Curated annotation (Swiss-Prot):
Cross-referenced InterPro entries: YcgL-like_sf, YcgL_dom
Disulfides per UniProt: none
Pfam family, one: YcgL
Superkingdom per UniProt: Bacteria
Name of this protein: YcgL domain-containing protein Spro_2755
Domain YcgL: 1-85
Species of origin: Serratia proteamaculans (strain 568)
SUPFAM superfamilies given in the database record: YcgL-like
Amino acid sequence: MLCVIYRSSKRDQTYLYVEKKDDFSRVPEDLLKSFGTPQLAMVLSLEGREKLASADIEKVKEALKEEGFYLQVPPPLENLLKQHLSDDKK
């Protein structure tokens, strides 16, 4: 299974995985608007892979099969002040 990965032009560290190059027919229009102009990042074979760098490969495969796309968003930012204050209370 091949997938094509696009980088968002509007959102840092946000990627859209689709099955075919430049085929966004199954991606909701509102998502594409907020994603911005997709910038090709890479074409990747999922066959024989056990993991991906920043996404669960099984979730990616399932989403591609069921929905036709997978959206990878960055992890939430740590609130370092909150963490620091919490550590001080211990």
